[in-house]
């Protein structure tokens, strides 16, 4: 997983004290990971009630932004889709078909930026972005989940599992829940 060095700062009588708690794993699908991605501007802000925000799911445009950054994909591709012109993530979306990542969402002509994305589609996008971009490639694959066999992205899920990039979907460590949407 991506790690973030957490260093909380406290102030007493005008004196700042910083303590380091070490590197903390930040999965893209964990609450901490999603908060990190949101703070980095890679997710749309949620301005609704807290319960509505908790029920919000990751969109294709947000996934494009995340995988573009994670994979180190260039943001200078020409305009690829006509339905993303109003998206703040248009530059990230434009790179998707030039690196073959559009196969993960099965949408060759329209990107549909506000559609939600499933865990297996996101796994596919991550692997393809890392393979195509400037990030160090992932190696190996392990079949640690018992429920992803029907997904057409089983190989990509297994690569992410071998590299500890994406966690199980629940406290049952052998479940990936490939069709489940990623809630933010």
Explain the meaning of each model-derived region:
Residues 2-32, 39-61, 67-94, 98-120, ...:
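Feature responds to low-complexity, polar/acidic, surface-exposed segments characteristic
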């Amino acid at each position: 997983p991506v790690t973030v060095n957490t260093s909380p700062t406290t102030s007493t009588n005008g004196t700042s004290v910083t303590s380091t708690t070490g590197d903390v794993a930040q999965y893209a699908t964990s609450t901490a990971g999603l908060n990190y991605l949101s703070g980095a501007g890679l997710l749309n802000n949620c301005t609704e009630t807290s319960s509505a925000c908790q029920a919000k799911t990751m969109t294709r445009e947000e996934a494009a932004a995340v995988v573009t950054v994670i994979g180190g994909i260039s943001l200078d591709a020409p305009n690829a889709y006509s339905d993303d012109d109003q998206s703040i993530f248009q530059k990230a979306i434009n790179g998707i078909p030039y690196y073959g990542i559009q196969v993960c969402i099965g949408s060759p002509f329209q990107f549909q930026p506000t559609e939600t994305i499933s865990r297996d589609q996101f796994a596919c996008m991550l692997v393809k972005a890392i393979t195509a971009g400037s990030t160090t490639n992932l190696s190996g694959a392990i079949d640690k989940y018992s429920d992803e066999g029907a997904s057409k992205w089983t190989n990509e899920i297994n690569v992410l599992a071998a590299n500890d990039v994406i966690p199980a979907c629940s406290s049952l460590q052998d479940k990936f829940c490939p069709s489940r949407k990623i809630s933010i």
